[in-house]
Amino acid sequence: MNRDEMYLSLGVSDKVLQFGEAVLDELKPRFAGIEEIAELNQAKVIGAMQKNRVNATHFAASTGYGYDDEGRDNLERVYASAFHTEAALVRPQITCGTHALAIALSANLLPGDEMLAISGKPYDTLEEVIGLRESPCSLKEYGVSYGQVDLREDGSFDFPAIERALNDKTKLIHIQRSKGYCPRPTISVDAIGEAIAFCKKLRPDVVVMVDNCYGEFVEANEPSDFGADMIVGSLIKNPGGGLAPIGGYICGTQKCVDRCAYRLSAPGLGQEVGANLGLMPALYQGFFLAPSVVSGAVKGAVFVAACYEKLGF
C-alpha cells in the first residue's frame, strides 16, 4: 500500500489530500514559529529536570500518608523551576482545574475580602465556587464578596475601570488566560504581564492569580514570569502531556502555595502528606513531553482553522 492508497483507505480522497498539503505548505512560516516556542519550552523543562536531578528513584510509588515522598516533592520542585516560582503544589489529589482554582481562591481569601475578576466573568464551572450561582461552601457563603471588570470590546484590559474597582477590601485579582466559553480572544502573556504590573503599582499587596488552564507552553513565557502570585491549572490539560490521568497544580509564591497546601490537606499537614499512588512516571514523563504535545495541538488547530477559512467559513 502506497501513501495515496493509505489515505484513500481512511476515506481521504486525492482531492482532499492535495488541498490539505497546499494549506500545510502555506503554513510553514507559522509552524516554524510554533516549533521555536516548543524548543524553548522543551529546554526550560529539561533544565528544570536537570537542576533537580530527576532520576529513577523519583518514580517510586507511595501509599498511605505519603510522608517523605521524594518523587512527589521533587516533581513540585521541577514545576517551580520550570515556571520560575518560589514553590509549587502538584498533586493527583487535585482532581481537575476547577478544583485547583477553588483551592487557590478559598486558601487566599478570608471573610470580608473581595475577589476581583478583571478579565470578565470566569468559566461557568467557577460560578458556584464564587457564589454567582448558589451553592453550599461557596466563597459567598463564607463572606467573600465578588467584583468584576469586563474586557474592552477589542479584548484588552479596561485599566481605568480596574483602577475604579480596586478598593481596600480587594485581596485577590483573578485573570483568566483562556477565552473559555466566551467569544473574546484568549489573552496573551504580554497583555497579562501589563495588567499585573498595573495592579501591583496600585496595590503591591494584592494577590494576582492567573487561571492558566489551556495556556501552558503555548507561548515562550508564562504569567509567573511577569509577577503573577499564583498560576493555576490542570494536569489533565497541557502540562500532563496527555499521559497524566489526573491532577492539578498551583505554582507561585511560598506564602500562597503554603496556604493552598493547608487547604488541600489540613492545617499543620500541608505538603507533608499525599501519596503519589504510583503516578509519578506518568506525571514526570507527561511534563517532559508537554511542550511537544502542546505544539502539535496548536499546529493542528491552526491547520484546521486555515482549512475552514479557505472553504469560506
Regions found by a protein language model. Name each.
Residues 40-43:
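Flexible, glycine-rich loop/tail regions that form catalytic "lids" or insertion modules at the edges
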Residues 76:
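Generic structural marker for isolated residues within well-ordered, non-membrane alpha-helices
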Residues 61:
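Aromatic- and Gly/Pro-rich donor/ligand-binding loops
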Residues 2-28, 35, 45-51, 55-58, ...:
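Conserved PLP-enzyme active-site core in the AAT-like
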